[in-house]
Amino acid sequence: MKILLVFDFDNTIIDDNSDTWIVQCAPNKKLPIELRDSYRKGFWTEFMGRVFKYLGDKGVREHEMKRAVTSLPFTPGMVELFNFIRKNKDKFDCIIISDSNSVFIDWVLEAASFHDIFDKVFTNPAAFNSNGHLTVENYHTHSCNRCPKNLCKKVVLIEFVDKQLQQGVNYTQIVYIGDGGNDVCPVTFLKNDDVAMPRKGYTLQKTLSRMSQNLEPMEYSVVVWSSGVDIISHLQFLIKD
């Protein structure tokens, strides 16, 4: 029986937001005001589609975007964590559920040779079209009013766990490692033995702290981390038996 590790990507695996990082490829490293102002809450993926079109129209090519994305720094201790997981892969399944896109995540994992760590990546599908423009689509449609229109991470997590159960894979625990507001919804799926691991000082940690103070029911335990090394320590504790 294995433990399921669920990772967010932006500000969790990498120490920045890949979507805002790519703006450095724009002329003068900024977007025009009318494009910036076109964002509507809950519709980030559509907004990024317009950003990618703007970059393409300005002549920004795939190799330039790839160079920018692969220069994104890993969060402190994350490389050590992935090496630890690789050595203990018989004890863990790992998935990514991210609001980024498949092209950016592929580039980062490939450049660092970490593809083998992850059994599945759930994110907004992206590809370069015949004009050389990066296009991105919503991962799915859902009815959750807590999450952005393109992705409810809780729905994805439930579907993955159910599918694994149908194939005879039952996890002893789920450990959810994230940072953002859109990680709150999947954390509410966690049960008794599961662990929510919010990054210290980020929205997820602040929200879980507020929920705890309000005495909202939380079956799972909460372990805060600042570095991947903190996560290693807790995983070592979980597998020591």
Curated annotation (Swiss-Prot):
GO terms for molecular function: metal ion binding; phosphatase activity; pyridoxal phosphatase activity. InterPro entries: HAD-like_sf (IPR036412), HAD_hydro_PyrdxlP_Pase-like (IPR006384), HAD_sf (IPR023214), Pase_PHOSPHO-typ (IPR016965). The active site is at residues 8, 10. Gene3D superfamilies: HAD superfamily/HAD-like. Its EC number is 3.1.3.74. The keyword GTP-binding does not apply. It is an enzyme of class 3 (hydrolase). Keywords: Hydrolase, Magnesium, Metal-binding, Pyridoxal phosphate. NCBIfam families: DKMTPPase-SF, HAD-SF-IB. Belongs to the HAD-like hydrolase superfamily. PHOSPHO family. This is Pyridoxal phosphate phosphatase PHOSPHO2. It comes from Homo sapiens.
